[in-house]
Amino acid sequence: MDEAKEENRRLKSSLSKIKKDFDILQTQYNQLMAKHNEPTKFQSKGHHQDKGEDEDREKVNEREELVSLSLGRRLNSEVPSGSNKEEKNKDVEEAEGDRNYDDNEKSSIQGLSMGIEYKALSNPNEKLEIDHNQETMSLEISNNNKIRSQNSFGFKNDGDDHEDEDEILPQNLVKKTRVSVRSRCETPTMNDGCQWRKYGQKIAKGNPCPRAYYRCTIAASCPVRKQVQRCSEDMSILISTYEGTHNHPLPMSATAMASATSAAASMLLSGASSSSSAAADLHGLNFSLSGNNITPKPKTHFLQSPSSSGHPTVTLDLTTSSSSQQPFLSMLNRFSSPPSNVSRSNSYPSTNLNFSNNTNTLMNWGGGGNPSDQYRAAYGNINTHQQSPYHKIIQTRTAGSSFDPFGRSSSSHSPQINLDHIGIKNIISHQVPSLPAETIKAITTDPSFQSALATALSSIMGGDLKIDHNVTRNEAEKSP
């Protein structure tokens, strides 16, 4: 309280001093104005009074400068004419600015800042323009982020016009790889062995059936998403589109679809087929490859496929009635309820559904041991009386042919498959269309595909497994 009282006392004394100075200056100003309006008294006098007249004029000018210093602003009619007066007024304004600066500095030291800053108010439109530009930039950034978030999983592209697709097409170049699976299913979703939670659905253009969106719930941080939609041409066909990579171990019931989608995605990412319309029939599974060069106007291969939004996509068609496709369908059914006599040992510690070129495998191929010993330790011996549709994969390397996990050869002649080591004496010869050399190399050099295939075989057999590995992984990598 004492400090406040002392400050109020100093403030009152300063105000009284300012008021007193103002009254004195006002009186001087009135006197000068009265003299300015009167006729000059020195004009009728002689030449001997010129010197005194000049002195009086200098005194008047000095008084005018004092007035200008106190008030700072005068009307044009009150300013004396002549270039000398204008120069003096400029000097007066500069002196006034210096004096005001000194006064403000002194008052700020005493805690009595009474000055008004005119600089911020000199051009208010400039500040408004800057604020408007900043607001416009923030709105543009938020709109761009909103568009990117809507297009991150293709939620909006199928329902838009072709003009919107033309604008979004450059962003599709960096989108993730998708694996679309077409299957005949009466249930709302296909039982792929994984755990999913539905978080939304949307009506797409040209399809009365809604498109449902699911996310993997095995791990909270799993980025894998799945889109499910019925085909508009055939309501019995369910189209499931997978996107992302699991970052957690998968249950054994999910490894069948994991191996199929992993192999398909690896083929696409390895560049086995550069044409967007190319298709390969691998044991009855119709692989349709579509790269980044998709044009927005033709949605040709599967019109209602959720993956037709510009993502690099592989389509696995399980709807055909090919006899060679039945083993894969039975494999899916068996994986949904795995046999009890298959040991879930540490031979396959990491079961990752890999949609990218990753070296994570479903089995441990390292460790310096023989892979066949690992199979024998995990599964024992295979039942020689059990005929599996995948027995053609177990083969020896023939002269002049490269190893193919699908039982095919890149050479023109038909391969010979020797099955003597599992009790079959005859040699089966069959003619199949050859695959591109790049596709064979991409498949054989992918350890995740080989390990996933071995795991699938062990579950299909339901018994002991013994595989004669005449071709090791290093030899497969060196093969043409």
From Swiss-Prot:
Residues 57-66, 84-106 have a biased composition (Basic and acidic residues). It is found in: Nucleus. Residues 30-108 are annotated as: Disordered. GO terms for cellular component: nucleus. Residues 185-251 bind DNA. PANTHER family: WRKY TRANSCRIPTION FACTOR 36-RELATED, WRKY TRANSCRIPTION FACTOR 61-RELATED. The gene is WRKY61. The keyword Nucleus applies. PROSITE patterns: WRKY (PS50811). InterPro entries: WRKY_dom, WRKY_dom_sf, WRKY_plant. Its main location: nucleus. SMART domains: WRKY (SM00774). It comes from the Eukaryota. Transcription factor. Interacts specifically with the W box (5'-(T)TGAC[CT]-3'), a frequently occurring elicitor-responsive cis-acting element. This is Probable WRKY transcription factor 61. Keywords: DNA-binding, Nucleus, Transcription, Transcription regulation. One of its GO terms (molecular function) is DNA-binding transcription factor activity.
